[in-house]
Amino acid sequence: MGLFLILVVYFAYFAGYSSRELINNPYNKLQNLLAKSVTRGNIYSSDNKLLATTSTDSNGEEYRYYPYSEEYCHVVGSIGQGQYGLESAYNFELLSSNTGAMTKIINDFSGKKDAGDSLITTLDSEIQAAAYNALDGYDGAVIVMNSKTGAVKAMVSGPDYNPNTVSENWDEINADGSSVLLNRATQGLYTPGSVFKLITLYEYLKEGGDEENYSYDCTGSIEVDGNTINCNNGKSHGTVSLMNSFAYSCNCSFVNIGKTLSVKKIQETCSELLFGKELPVKLQSGKSSFKLQESDSDFVKAQTMFGQGETLISPMHAAILVSAIANGGTAMKPRLVESVQNDAGKEIKKYPAKEYKELFEPEMAEKLKTYMASVIKYGTAARLNQYANLMVYGKTGTAEIDSERNSNSWFIGFAEQKDTKENYTIVVVTENIPDGTYPAPAVTIAGQVLKVLD
Protein backbone atom coordinates (compact mmCIF):
# COMPACT_ATOMS: atom_id res chain seq x y z
CA MET A 1 0.00 0.00 0.00
CA GLY A 2 2.85 2.43 0.86
CA LEU A 3 4.56 1.84 -2.50
CA PHE A 4 1.26 2.37 -4.32
CA LEU A 5 0.74 5.75 -2.65
CA ILE A 6 4.24 6.88 -3.59
CA LEU A 7 3.51 5.99 -7.20
CA VAL A 8 0.29 8.01 -7.03
CA VAL A 9 2.24 11.10 -5.97
CA TYR A 10 4.80 10.74 -8.74
CA PHE A 11 2.09 10.10 -11.32
CA ALA A 12 0.44 13.38 -10.34
CA TYR A 13 3.76 15.17 -10.80
CA PHE A 14 4.47 13.76 -14.23
CA ALA A 15 0.88 14.40 -15.27
CA GLY A 16 1.75 18.11 -15.09
CA TYR A 17 0.98 19.02 -11.47
CA SER A 18 3.35 20.16 -8.81
CA SER A 19 3.42 17.39 -6.22
CA ARG A 20 4.40 19.93 -3.57
CA GLU A 21 1.35 22.12 -4.23
CA LEU A 22 -0.82 19.05 -4.53
CA ILE A 23 0.13 17.70 -1.13
CA ASN A 24 0.20 21.09 0.59
CA ASN A 25 -3.38 21.83 -0.44
CA PRO A 26 -5.37 21.22 2.78
CA TYR A 27 -8.44 20.22 0.76
CA ASN A 28 -6.60 17.42 -1.03
CA LYS A 29 -7.34 14.01 0.45
CA LEU A 30 -4.05 12.65 -0.86
CA GLN A 31 -2.22 14.04 2.17
CA ASN A 32 -4.53 12.00 4.39
CA LEU A 33 -3.63 8.90 2.40
CA LEU A 34 0.07 9.69 2.69
CA ALA A 35 -0.34 10.11 6.45
CA LYS A 36 -1.45 6.46 6.53
CA SER A 37 1.90 5.32 5.14
CA VAL A 38 4.26 7.99 6.53
CA THR A 39 4.63 9.11 10.14
CA ARG A 40 4.85 12.89 9.96
CA GLY A 41 8.39 14.13 10.57
CA ASN A 42 9.64 16.21 13.48
CA ILE A 43 10.40 19.92 13.60
CA TYR A 44 13.50 21.14 15.47
CA SER A 45 15.03 24.47 16.41
CA SER A 46 18.50 25.31 15.11
CA ASP A 47 19.90 24.26 18.50
CA ASN A 48 18.14 20.88 18.35
CA LYS A 49 15.13 21.56 20.57
CA LEU A 50 12.12 19.43 19.58
CA LEU A 51 9.31 21.76 18.52
CA ALA A 52 6.82 19.31 16.98
CA THR A 53 6.59 15.53 16.89
CA THR A 54 4.15 12.70 16.26
CA SER A 55 3.18 10.68 19.34
CA THR A 56 0.84 7.75 19.90
CA ASP A 57 -1.96 7.64 22.47
CA SER A 58 -3.09 4.67 24.57
CA ASN A 59 -5.33 3.50 21.74
CA GLY A 60 -2.49 3.45 19.26
CA GLU A 61 -3.74 6.57 17.47
CA GLU A 62 -1.21 9.11 16.31
CA TYR A 63 -1.46 12.75 17.32
CA ARG A 64 0.72 15.80 16.86
CA TYR A 65 2.46 17.08 20.00
CA TYR A 66 4.05 20.51 20.50
CA PRO A 67 6.38 20.47 23.54
CA TYR A 68 6.67 24.27 23.76
CA SER A 69 2.93 24.80 23.38
CA GLU A 70 2.12 28.51 22.92
CA GLU A 71 5.71 29.73 22.54
CA TYR A 72 6.07 28.59 18.93
CA CYS A 73 2.40 28.31 18.05
CA HIS A 74 2.29 30.75 15.13
CA VAL A 75 5.62 30.04 13.50
CA VAL A 76 5.54 26.24 13.85
CA GLY A 77 1.77 26.19 13.47
CA SER A 78 -0.46 23.18 13.88
CA ILE A 79 -2.41 20.56 11.96
CA GLY A 80 -5.88 19.18 12.42
CA GLN A 81 -8.51 21.89 12.11
CA GLY A 82 -6.76 23.58 9.21
CA GLN A 83 -2.99 23.87 8.83
CA TYR A 84 -0.82 26.78 9.86
CA GLY A 85 2.79 27.91 9.99
CA LEU A 86 5.65 25.61 9.07
CA GLU A 87 3.35 22.62 9.43
CA SER A 88 1.45 23.93 6.41
CA ALA A 89 4.28 25.49 4.40
CA TYR A 90 6.43 22.36 4.62
CA ASN A 91 3.67 19.77 4.63
CA PHE A 92 5.21 18.10 1.56
CA GLU A 93 8.58 17.65 3.26
CA LEU A 94 7.10 16.39 6.54
CA LEU A 95 5.01 13.79 4.70
CA SER A 96 7.94 12.68 2.56
CA SER A 97 10.17 9.83 3.68
CA ASN A 98 13.80 9.35 2.75
CA THR A 99 14.37 6.51 5.16
CA GLY A 100 16.61 3.69 3.96
CA ALA A 101 15.47 1.64 0.95
CA MET A 102 15.63 -1.66 2.83
CA THR A 103 13.67 -0.16 5.72
CA LYS A 104 10.98 0.96 3.28
CA ILE A 105 10.71 -2.54 1.84
CA ILE A 106 10.47 -4.10 5.29
CA ASN A 107 7.89 -1.53 6.40
CA ASP A 108 5.86 -2.09 3.24
CA PHE A 109 5.63 -5.82 3.81
CA SER A 110 5.06 -5.56 7.57
CA GLY A 111 2.46 -2.81 7.31
CA LYS A 112 4.53 -0.31 9.29
CA LYS A 113 4.75 3.35 8.43
CA ASP A 114 7.88 4.96 7.04
CA ALA A 115 9.45 7.69 9.16
CA GLY A 116 8.82 11.14 7.70
CA ASP A 117 11.60 13.63 7.10
CA SER A 118 12.25 16.34 9.68
CA LEU A 119 12.74 20.09 9.47
CA ILE A 120 15.73 21.80 11.05
CA THR A 121 14.59 25.39 11.46
CA THR A 122 16.61 28.59 11.77
CA LEU A 123 14.89 29.40 15.07
CA ASP A 124 17.09 29.86 18.13
CA SER A 125 15.42 28.64 21.32
CA GLU A 126 17.11 31.21 23.58
CA ILE A 127 16.21 34.17 21.35
CA GLN A 128 12.69 32.80 20.78
CA ALA A 129 12.15 32.43 24.53
CA ALA A 130 13.35 35.99 25.14
CA ALA A 131 11.02 37.37 22.47
CA TYR A 132 8.06 35.32 23.70
CA ASN A 133 8.55 36.27 27.35
CA ALA A 134 9.04 39.93 26.46
CA LEU A 135 5.83 40.13 24.40
CA ASP A 136 3.85 38.37 27.13
CA GLY A 137 0.52 40.12 27.74
CA TYR A 138 0.62 42.25 24.59
CA ASP A 139 -1.05 41.71 21.25
CA GLY A 140 1.51 42.25 18.52
CA ALA A 141 4.61 40.63 17.10
CA VAL A 142 8.37 40.24 17.45
CA ILE A 143 10.77 39.21 14.69
CA VAL A 144 14.50 38.65 15.06
CA MET A 145 16.39 37.88 11.85
CA ASN A 146 20.03 37.54 10.89
CA SER A 147 20.48 40.51 8.58
CA LYS A 148 23.29 38.90 6.57
CA THR A 149 21.70 35.47 5.99
CA GLY A 150 17.95 36.04 6.27
CA ALA A 151 17.73 33.31 8.92
CA VAL A 152 14.78 34.05 11.21
CA LYS A 153 15.95 33.46 14.78
CA ALA A 154 12.66 34.28 16.51
CA MET A 155 9.08 34.89 15.44
CA VAL A 156 6.39 35.53 18.02
CA SER A 157 2.79 36.71 17.68
CA GLY A 158 0.24 37.59 20.33
CA PRO A 159 -2.36 36.70 21.39
CA ASP A 160 -1.28 33.07 21.27
CA TYR A 161 -3.03 29.71 21.51
CA ASN A 162 -2.24 26.15 22.53
CA PRO A 163 -1.59 24.14 19.34
CA ASN A 164 -2.09 20.90 21.29
CA THR A 165 -5.78 21.67 21.87
CA VAL A 166 -6.86 23.41 18.66
CA SER A 167 -9.32 20.69 17.66
CA GLU A 168 -10.94 20.52 21.11
CA ASN A 169 -11.22 24.32 21.35
CA TRP A 170 -12.03 25.04 17.70
CA ASP A 171 -15.44 26.61 18.32
CA GLU A 172 -14.06 28.82 21.08
CA ILE A 173 -11.11 29.88 18.92
CA ASN A 174 -13.39 30.78 16.03
CA ALA A 175 -15.66 32.78 18.31
CA ASP A 176 -12.72 34.73 19.77
CA GLY A 177 -12.64 38.21 18.24
CA SER A 178 -8.89 38.64 18.79
CA SER A 179 -7.89 36.48 15.79
CA VAL A 180 -5.58 34.24 17.80
CA LEU A 181 -4.69 32.09 14.77
CA LEU A 182 -3.42 35.12 12.84
CA ASN A 183 0.37 35.28 12.70
CA ARG A 184 0.73 39.01 13.21
CA ALA A 185 4.45 38.83 12.40
CA THR A 186 3.73 38.05 8.75
CA GLN A 187 0.00 38.65 8.25
CA GLY A 188 -0.63 41.64 10.51
CA LEU A 189 -0.94 45.01 8.75
CA TYR A 190 -0.35 48.09 10.88
CA THR A 191 -0.25 51.86 10.57
CA PRO A 192 3.52 52.45 10.71
CA GLY A 193 3.55 55.70 12.64
CA SER A 194 6.97 57.28 12.95
CA VAL A 195 8.89 54.25 11.66
CA PHE A 196 7.69 55.45 8.22
CA LYS A 197 9.91 58.50 8.72
CA LEU A 198 12.75 56.24 7.64
CA ILE A 199 11.17 56.09 4.18
CA THR A 200 10.34 59.81 4.15
CA LEU A 201 13.95 60.54 5.06
CA TYR A 202 15.16 58.17 2.35
CA GLU A 203 12.97 59.89 -0.25
CA TYR A 204 14.18 63.33 0.84
CA LEU A 205 17.80 62.24 0.41
CA LYS A 206 17.01 60.57 -2.93
CA GLU A 207 15.43 63.74 -4.24
CA GLY A 208 18.53 65.74 -3.35
CA GLY A 209 17.32 67.39 -0.17
CA ASP A 210 19.74 69.76 1.54
CA GLU A 211 20.98 67.39 4.21
CA GLU A 212 23.73 69.62 5.58
CA ASN A 213 21.81 72.88 5.83
CA TYR A 214 18.31 71.64 6.67
CA SER A 215 16.86 73.42 9.69
CA TYR A 216 13.38 73.63 11.16
CA ASP A 217 12.02 75.55 14.15
CA CYS A 218 9.63 73.18 15.92
CA THR A 219 7.08 74.81 18.23
CA GLY A 220 5.36 71.51 19.03
CA SER A 221 2.57 71.87 16.46
CA ILE A 222 1.92 72.84 12.85
CA GLU A 223 -1.24 73.88 11.01
CA VAL A 224 -2.16 72.16 7.73
CA ASP A 225 -5.47 72.86 5.97
CA GLY A 226 -6.95 74.16 9.23
CA ASN A 227 -5.90 71.01 11.10
CA THR A 228 -3.34 70.95 13.89
CA ILE A 229 -0.62 68.31 13.80
CA ASN A 230 1.31 67.90 17.05
CA CYS A 231 4.61 66.40 18.00
CA ASN A 232 4.42 63.73 20.69
CA ASN A 233 2.62 65.26 23.69
CA GLY A 234 2.87 68.65 21.98
CA LYS A 235 6.57 68.82 22.83
CA SER A 236 8.55 71.63 21.21
CA HIS A 237 11.86 70.40 19.81
CA GLY A 238 13.18 73.87 19.04
CA THR A 239 15.50 74.31 16.09
CA VAL A 240 16.36 70.89 14.66
CA SER A 241 18.69 69.68 11.94
CA LEU A 242 17.72 66.81 9.65
CA MET A 243 19.58 64.36 11.88
CA ASN A 244 17.87 65.63 15.03
CA SER A 245 14.48 65.71 13.32
CA PHE A 246 14.90 61.96 12.86
CA ALA A 247 16.52 61.24 16.21
CA TYR A 248 13.80 63.06 18.17
CA SER A 249 11.06 61.94 15.75
CA CYS A 250 9.76 65.46 15.16
CA ASN A 251 6.39 65.21 13.40
CA CYS A 252 6.31 68.88 12.51
CA SER A 253 9.69 68.77 10.84
CA PHE A 254 8.69 65.74 8.80
CA VAL A 255 5.52 67.52 7.68
CA ASN A 256 7.82 70.32 6.54
CA ILE A 257 10.08 67.82 4.75
CA GLY A 258 7.08 66.20 3.10
CA LYS A 259 6.05 69.48 1.50
CA THR A 260 9.16 69.33 -0.67
CA LEU A 261 8.63 65.77 -1.93
CA SER A 262 7.07 64.56 -5.16
CA VAL A 263 4.06 62.33 -4.54
CA LYS A 264 4.78 60.47 -7.78
CA LYS A 265 8.37 59.81 -6.77
CA ILE A 266 7.52 58.59 -3.29
CA GLN A 267 4.89 56.31 -4.84
CA GLU A 268 7.63 54.86 -7.04
CA THR A 269 9.96 54.53 -4.07
CA CYS A 270 7.35 52.70 -2.00
CA SER A 271 6.72 50.33 -4.89
CA GLU A 272 10.46 49.64 -5.12
CA LEU A 273 10.43 49.02 -1.37
CA LEU A 274 7.79 46.27 -1.74
CA PHE A 275 4.60 48.16 -0.84
CA GLY A 276 1.79 46.45 -2.70
CA LYS A 277 4.05 43.46 -3.44
CA GLU A 278 4.12 39.85 -2.32
CA LEU A 279 6.89 39.26 0.22
CA PRO A 280 9.54 36.58 -0.40
CA VAL A 281 8.49 34.42 2.55
CA LYS A 282 7.15 30.86 2.78
CA LEU A 283 4.51 31.63 5.41
CA GLN A 284 1.28 33.40 4.53
CA SER A 285 1.88 37.14 4.60
CA GLY A 286 -0.09 40.35 4.32
CA LYS A 287 0.51 42.83 1.51
CA SER A 288 1.53 46.30 2.70
CA SER A 289 -0.09 49.33 1.09
CA PHE A 290 0.80 52.93 0.29
CA LYS A 291 -2.24 54.80 -1.02
CA LEU A 292 -1.18 58.45 -1.19
CA GLN A 293 -2.35 60.19 -4.38
CA GLU A 294 -1.57 63.54 -6.02
CA SER A 295 -5.22 64.48 -5.57
CA ASP A 296 -5.17 63.99 -1.79
CA SER A 297 -5.43 67.02 0.46
CA ASP A 298 -2.36 68.67 1.96
CA PHE A 299 -3.48 67.36 5.35
CA VAL A 300 -3.55 63.74 4.12
CA LYS A 301 -0.15 64.23 2.50
CA ALA A 302 1.21 65.69 5.73
CA GLN A 303 -0.14 62.80 7.82
CA THR A 304 1.35 60.27 5.45
CA MET A 305 4.84 61.73 5.73
CA PHE A 306 5.08 60.89 9.43
CA GLY A 307 3.35 57.52 9.17
CA GLN A 308 -0.32 58.20 9.81
CA GLY A 309 -3.01 58.15 7.11
CA GLU A 310 -3.84 54.98 5.17
CA THR A 311 -0.37 53.45 4.89
CA LEU A 312 -0.13 49.89 6.23
CA ILE A 313 2.90 47.67 6.72
CA SER A 314 3.54 44.21 8.16
CA PRO A 315 6.28 43.49 10.70
CA MET A 316 7.94 41.10 8.24
CA HIS A 317 7.97 43.79 5.55
CA ALA A 318 9.59 46.18 8.03
CA ALA A 319 12.16 43.51 8.90
CA ILE A 320 13.10 43.04 5.24
CA LEU A 321 13.61 46.80 4.77
CA VAL A 322 15.67 47.22 7.94
CA SER A 323 17.78 44.13 7.26
CA ALA A 324 18.62 45.51 3.82
CA ILE A 325 19.98 48.70 5.40
CA ALA A 326 21.97 46.60 7.87
CA ASN A 327 23.33 44.48 5.02
CA GLY A 328 24.66 47.31 2.87
CA GLY A 329 21.42 47.81 0.94
CA THR A 330 20.74 44.22 -0.13
CA ALA A 331 17.86 42.28 1.39
CA MET A 332 18.35 38.57 1.96
CA LYS A 333 15.44 36.22 1.42
CA PRO A 334 13.91 35.49 4.84
CA ARG A 335 14.06 31.80 5.66
CA LEU A 336 12.81 29.69 8.52
CA VAL A 337 14.27 26.31 7.58
CA GLU A 338 17.96 25.38 7.39
CA SER A 339 17.56 21.84 6.11
CA VAL A 340 15.48 18.70 5.76
CA GLN A 341 16.86 15.51 7.30
CA ASN A 342 15.74 11.90 7.21
CA ASP A 343 15.13 9.80 10.32
CA ALA A 344 18.83 8.88 10.50
CA GLY A 345 19.89 12.53 10.53
CA LYS A 346 21.15 12.54 6.94
CA GLU A 347 20.70 15.89 5.20
CA ILE A 348 18.24 15.55 2.31
CA LYS A 349 17.95 19.19 1.33
CA LYS A 350 19.73 22.40 2.31
CA TYR A 351 18.19 25.89 2.26
CA PRO A 352 21.20 28.21 1.94
CA ALA A 353 21.18 31.96 2.37
CA LYS A 354 20.02 33.72 -0.80
CA GLU A 355 20.07 37.34 -1.84
CA TYR A 356 16.62 38.72 -2.59
CA LYS A 357 17.35 42.10 -4.15
CA GLU A 358 19.10 45.41 -3.63
CA LEU A 359 16.60 47.78 -2.04
CA PHE A 360 19.00 50.64 -1.25
CA GLU A 361 22.23 51.73 -2.88
CA PRO A 362 25.16 50.88 -0.56
CA GLU A 363 26.04 54.54 0.01
CA MET A 364 22.44 55.33 0.92
CA ALA A 365 22.22 52.34 3.27
CA GLU A 366 25.33 53.56 5.07
CA LYS A 367 23.88 57.05 5.37
CA LEU A 368 20.57 55.75 6.76
CA LYS A 369 22.55 53.77 9.35
CA THR A 370 24.02 57.00 10.71
CA TYR A 371 20.53 58.42 11.18
CA MET A 372 19.34 55.23 12.90
CA ALA A 373 22.41 55.37 15.16
CA SER A 374 21.37 58.84 16.35
CA VAL A 375 18.04 57.46 17.61
CA ILE A 376 19.97 55.13 19.93
CA LYS A 377 22.79 57.51 20.89
CA TYR A 378 20.59 60.39 22.08
CA GLY A 379 17.14 60.12 20.52
CA THR A 380 13.85 58.40 21.30
CA ALA A 381 15.46 55.01 22.01
CA ALA A 382 18.49 56.25 23.96
CA ARG A 383 17.80 53.75 26.75
CA LEU A 384 18.93 51.02 24.34
CA ASN A 385 22.42 52.56 24.30
CA GLN A 386 23.65 50.29 27.08
CA TYR A 387 24.97 47.03 25.64
CA ALA A 388 28.72 46.44 25.85
CA ASN A 389 28.96 44.05 22.90
CA LEU A 390 26.36 45.63 20.61
CA MET A 391 26.20 48.53 18.21
CA VAL A 392 22.47 49.28 18.02
CA TYR A 393 20.59 51.22 15.33
CA GLY A 394 16.86 51.89 15.27
CA LYS A 395 13.71 53.91 14.85
CA THR A 396 10.76 54.14 17.21
CA GLY A 397 7.18 54.72 16.22
CA THR A 398 3.82 55.54 17.76
CA ALA A 399 0.82 55.17 15.47
CA GLU A 400 -2.47 56.58 16.75
CA ILE A 401 -5.30 54.21 15.85
CA ASP A 402 -8.47 55.70 17.36
CA SER A 403 -10.13 58.86 18.66
CA GLU A 404 -9.00 58.07 22.22
CA ARG A 405 -5.37 58.27 21.08
CA ASN A 406 -4.66 54.62 21.74
CA SER A 407 -1.72 53.60 19.61
CA ASN A 408 0.48 50.89 18.21
CA SER A 409 4.02 51.03 19.54
CA TRP A 410 6.89 50.20 17.16
CA PHE A 411 10.59 49.56 17.25
CA ILE A 412 12.53 48.66 14.12
CA GLY A 413 16.28 48.33 14.09
CA PHE A 414 19.31 46.11 14.11
CA ALA A 415 22.26 45.29 16.33
CA GLU A 416 25.77 44.26 15.37
CA GLN A 417 27.81 42.17 17.78
CA LYS A 418 31.23 43.77 18.19
CA ASP A 419 33.07 40.47 18.68
CA THR A 420 31.43 38.18 16.09
CA LYS A 421 30.19 40.90 13.69
CA GLU A 422 26.89 39.01 13.49
CA ASN A 423 24.05 41.38 12.69
CA TYR A 424 20.46 40.93 13.85
CA THR A 425 17.37 42.79 12.69
CA ILE A 426 14.73 43.34 15.36
CA VAL A 427 11.14 44.42 14.73
CA VAL A 428 8.57 44.83 17.49
CA VAL A 429 4.99 46.07 17.34
CA THR A 430 2.47 46.14 20.19
CA GLU A 431 -1.20 46.95 19.72
CA ASN A 432 -3.70 49.23 21.45
CA ILE A 433 -1.36 50.94 23.89
CA PRO A 434 -3.19 53.55 26.04
CA ASP A 435 -2.30 57.20 25.50
CA GLY A 436 0.52 58.38 27.73
CA THR A 437 2.08 54.96 28.30
CA TYR A 438 5.77 55.32 29.11
CA PRO A 439 8.19 53.81 28.43
CA ALA A 440 7.09 52.68 24.98
CA PRO A 441 6.41 48.92 25.21
CA ALA A 442 8.06 48.12 21.87
CA VAL A 443 11.36 49.65 23.00
CA THR A 444 11.20 47.76 26.30
CA ILE A 445 10.58 44.48 24.46
CA ALA A 446 13.42 45.18 22.04
CA GLY A 447 15.68 45.80 25.02
CA GLN A 448 14.89 42.40 26.50
CA VAL A 449 15.78 40.73 23.20
CA LEU A 450 18.99 42.76 22.93
CA LYS A 451 20.10 41.48 26.35
CA VAL A 452 20.20 37.96 24.93
CA LEU A 453 22.15 39.11 21.88
CA ASP A 454 24.66 41.15 23.91
Outline where the language-model segments fall:
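Periplasmic/cell-envelope proteins involved in peptidoglycan metabolism and beta-lactam response
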Residues: M1-W170, V180, L189, Y214, ...
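Beta-lactam-recognizing serine transpeptidase/beta-lactamase-like catalytic domain environment
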Residues: D47, K148-S194, I199-T430, Y438
